[in-house]
């Protein structure tokens, strides 16, 4: 095992609590997600019910050994994938049913935009291939409770205090989408 990051290695002095996915650029830069700066691995249910933007997209430079936050305020930052030409990187926002695009090169470098939104389920991991297709795993269909309670923190707190057996349960169904580099579904 090689340890290249400590929990306190972020440039913003925010601990890395839930490092989730990564992709490595040809120059060695490591792009990765921290799903939640508040909760650690195994606490995704808390993150789901709290529904707050605690996630981040970061990059680690192995030469300078510095970690930089590229995007913060993400709702459970999850899968990460570079485009085939490495001009942008994608990061899933699981709790918002969408994927963000962060530009690395060109006129838009350093900015972000929505790559695709209103996905039919929670996007989990994402990977890309040489043909420019992004394969996105969706681990459950959209959840009515998440949608209804997204702007009702009091309701979410009440539900969190219920025994887990009485809390809303996910539908266990997963599927995969293939997206082109413009965010259009080309395989489902």
Feature-to-residue mapping (PLM):
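Sequence-structural signature of mature extracellular/luminal beta-sheet repeat domains
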Residues: 1-188
């Amino acid at each position: 095992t090689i340890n290249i990051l400590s929990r306190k290695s972020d440039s913003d002095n925010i601990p890395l609590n839930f490092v989730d996915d990564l992709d490595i650029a040809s120059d060695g830069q490591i792009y990765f997600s921290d799903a939640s700066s508040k909760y650690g691995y195994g606490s995704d249910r808390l993150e789901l019910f709290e529904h707050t933007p605690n996630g981040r997209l970061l990059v680690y430079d192995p030469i300078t050994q510095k970690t930089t936050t590229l995007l913060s305020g993400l709702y459970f930052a999850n899968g990460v994938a570079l485009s085939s030409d490495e001009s942008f990187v994608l990061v899933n926002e699981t709790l918002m049913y969408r994927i963000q695009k962060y530009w690395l090169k060109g006129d838009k470098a350093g900015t972000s935009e929505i790559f695709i939104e209103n996905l039919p389920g929670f996007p989990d991991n994402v990977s890309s291939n040489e043909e420019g297709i992004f394969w996105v795993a969706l681990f459950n269909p959209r959840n009515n409770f998440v949608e209804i309670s997204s702007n009702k923190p009091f309701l979410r707190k009440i539900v969190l205090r219920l025994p887990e057996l009485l809390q809303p349960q996910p539908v266990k169904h997963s599927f995969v989408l293939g997206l082109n580099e413009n965010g259009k579904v080309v395989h489902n």
